[in-house]
Amino acid sequence: MKVIFLKDVKGKGKKGEVKNVPDGYANNFLLKQGLAAEATNSSMKTLEAQKRKEEKDAAAELESAKQLKETLEKLTVELKAKSGEGGRLFGSITSKQIVDAMQKSHKIKLDKRKFEMDDAIRALGYTNVTVKLHPQVTATVKVHVSEQ
């Protein structure tokens, strides 16, 4: 029996795949558990429409990430912090502080977890911070830390 997998089934198939499975397995397990649906003409058309919609959404998401990358790479985030001798900061600048500053000054809202910082910023001056906007798109934001 041909079925369309609605969820991932270990060893049998992934969500969205169409496969031939034994009739008993399909009727007694996959269909009853809601893990798969019978592959009829109408369900195949629905699956194709759903795949096209997902591809369209993914393309739109990628395009918006590319536009945001262009915007981010043009701007500089200004932060002020107290510092001691040699330009060392008292404390550090975290990704949360960078996000808050971007929200305040440039009205750009990002998740702090998208920032890829090995360590927090602990010195005055300019620092380039990588932001992962999409699995295929990463941007570099220039952060300027000046003395308060």
Curated annotation (Swiss-Prot):
GO molecular function, one term: rRNA binding
Keywords of the record: Ribonucleoprotein, Ribosomal protein, RNA-binding, rRNA-binding
GO biological process: translation
Keyword match RNA-binding: yes
Superkingdom of origin: Bacteria
Single GO cellular component term: ribosome
InterPro entries: Ribosomal_bL9, Ribosomal_bL9/RNase_H1_N, Ribosomal_bL9_bac/chp, Ribosomal_bL9_C, Ribosomal_bL9_C_sf, Ribosomal_bL9_N, Ribosomal_bL9_N_sf
Pfam families the UniProt entry points to: Ribosomal_L9_C, Ribosomal_L9_N
Similarity remark: Belongs to the bacterial ribosomal protein bL9 family.
Function of the protein: Binds to the 23S rRNA.
PANTHER family: 50S RIBOSOMAL PROTEIN L9
Protein name: Large ribosomal subunit protein bL9
Native source organism of the sequence: Bacillus anthracis
